[in-house]
Design a protein with these regions (language model features):
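ER/Golgi luminal nucleotide-sugar-dependent glycosyltransferases, focusing on the catalytic module
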Residues: 1-263
Length: 263
């Protein structure tokens, strides 16, 4: 994101957050102030802001009933609105729906890993095809782990799981080896500061250990450089489903960068 997005975000009544070493005006909330890991943004993605929020006046930032996150290309929608509606202000979420009343966490609707196109499977899944040519033909065998190995580094998820704490290691291993969908993009909405803090405590302790394995290599290809974001993306789904009363909610892709209709 950049300063060019500022007025658009303000028009949507959202709070703009600038990540990493980009130049942002003073109206932006920054992840490089106070206690932070902003310098890791290229590898951690949006997690550098989640860390900042966790470490700096967490309860103050949770002064409303819910705290939620989205991207400049992905927005929570009103449940009854058609996703293809081009009028963004009429389709995105602006208030807490009644359906959330008895829930603690909102996760985006599931992304199913068996939706990969054949061309991408042939390009990224060579090792899996050599090991088991039928792995992509069955919903049962096309799991989160197979998908991760194909796109983000063969065998790296297994290595990372070994570094998880005893309370989550086997549960997360079972999750990625048996499930065919997860709640992608590291986007969620949370009602409880304690729940948010508990998640961050487990997540960032794990990712810190993973740094000893994967480091901060800028030479990694694009689909692998954000290794800690990709790991947390899968872990987020597992952890909140295990530890919270959650609800799944629709998300729409809408890039505001070149939007001439709404702005």
């Amino acid at each position: 994101m950049s300063n060019s997005h500022l007025e658009k975000i303000k028009k949507l009544n959202y709070i703009p957050v600038g990540l990493g070493n980009g130049e942002f005006d003073k109206e932006w909330v920054r992840d490089n102030t106070l206690e932070n890991i902003s310098y890791k943004n290229s590898w951690y993605g949006e997690n550098t802001f989640y860390y900042w929020l966790w470490k700096n006046n967490l309860n103050k930032n949770f002064d409303k009933e819910w705290v939620g996150f989205c991207h400049y290309r992905r927005f929570w929608t009103q449940n009854s609105v058609e996703k293809k509606n081009e009028i963004l202000l009429k389709s995105i979420l602006q208030k807490v729906p009644n359906e959330w009343k008895n829930h603690e966490v909102v996760l985006r609707e599931d992304f199913f890993v068996n939706s990969s196109k054949l061309s991408k499977i042939l390009k990224h899944g060579k090792k899996q095809l050599l090991k088991n040519p039928f792995v992509f033909l069955s919903k049962r065998t096309m799991t989160i782990k197979v998908h991760y190995d194909m796109y983000h580094g063969y065998g790296e998820l297994d290595k990372a799981i070994e570094l998880l704490d005893d309370q989550n290691r086997e549960g997360f291993r079972n999750f990625v080896n048996t499930q065919g969908s997860f709640n992608a993009n590291n986007i969620f909405i949370c009602k409880s500061p304690k729940l948010y803090a508990d998640y961050c405590d487990v997540l960032f302790k794990w990712l810190k250990k993973c740094e000893e394995l994967f480091g901060f290599d800028r030479a990694r290809e694009y689909s692998r450089i954000r290794v800690y974001a990709f790991l947390s993306e899968r872990f987020l789904s597992y952890w909140f489903k295990k530890n919270s009363n959650y609800i799944v909610w629709p998300l729409k892709f809408h890039d505001i960068s070149n939007d001439k209709i709404n702005f």
